[in-house]
């Protein structure tokens, strides 16, 4: 399997198996106070990097919330025919605080899963509350990703290297955690293995003919 195929397959798997499991706030840098009408969307998955706003795919509203699937390093064991790749997922979220309409009130509904459905609270009485607790969105997102990764030895036709640990944490600079409030970022790294795409050299091909 080629490097390009691996990155594309993992990105598609992340989009389906991780991003579809959670909805997070859609950023609005022009209105991140009480004027912001809260909107939740599924994060998007991108290969290698997160595109700028003017380069978003048609079905994606904003660069964040998102996951970028990056290749950190790789190695090919030609003798054993094994390719090993270190993959990093870069998770990004946005949350400046609690907005009107964000709180959901449980209402009994026998037809709903668990016996309850949810509806917005009283938005007239709610007020915007700027907080520093938006980091919780990032770690909820991260926990979902870890749960999906740790539950699958084989995903996207690629095998997780179970002998290598899954590592994760916040992004740091000079030992200090990034602080770009109200944006929150973290990473997850893991190792995958697959077969090395084998191509006979011209010299070998001539000998075999």
Please identify what each model-predicted range represents.
Residues 191-209:
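Protruding loop/beta-arch "assembly-hinge" segments enriched in small, turn-prone residues
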Residues 5, 64, 84, 136, ...:
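Short, well-structured alpha-helical interface segments that form or flank functional binding sites
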Residues 31, 81, 99, 175-176:
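Intrinsic-disorder/low-complexity loop/linker signature
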Residues 15-18, 97, 146-153:
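Short amphipathic alpha-helical signal-transduction/dimerization elements
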Residues 70-74, 78-127:
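Active-site-adjacent structural patch at catalytic or cofactor/ligand-binding sites
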Residues 121-197:
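Acidic-leaning, charged glycine-interspersed low-complexity segments
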Residues 1-80, 203-209:
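Small/polar-rich, solvent-exposed N-terminal microdomains that initiate assembly or binding
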Residues 64, 80-86, 181-189:
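A general secondary-structure signal for short beta-strands and their flanking turns/coil
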């Amino acid at each position: 399997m080629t490097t390009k195929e691996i990155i594309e397959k993992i990105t598609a798997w992340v989009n389906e198996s991780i991003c579809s499991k959670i909805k997070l706030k859609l950023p609005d840098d022009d209105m991140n106070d009480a004027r912001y009408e809260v909107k939740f969307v599924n994060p998007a998955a991108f290969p290698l990097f997160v595109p700028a706003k003017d380069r978003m795919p048609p079905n994606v509203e904003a660069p964040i919330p998102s996951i970028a699937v990056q290749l950190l390093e790789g190695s090919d064991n030609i003798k054993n025919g094994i390719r090993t790749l270190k993959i990093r997922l870069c998770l990004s979220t946005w949350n400046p605080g609690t907005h009107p309409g964000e709180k959901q009130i449980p209402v009994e509904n026998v037809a709903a899963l668990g016996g309850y459905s949810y509806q917005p609270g009283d938005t007239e009485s709610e007020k915007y509350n700027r907080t520093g607790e938006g980091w919780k969105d990032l770690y909820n997102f991260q926990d979902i990703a870890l749960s999906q990764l740790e539950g699958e030895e084989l995903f996207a036709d690629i095998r997780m290297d179970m002998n290598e640990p899954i590592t994760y944490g916040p992004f740091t600079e000079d030992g200090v955690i990034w602080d770009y409030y109200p944006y929150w970022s973290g990473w997850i790294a893991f190792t995958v293995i697959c077969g090395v795409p084998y191509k006979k050299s011209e010299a070998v091909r001539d000998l075999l003919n």
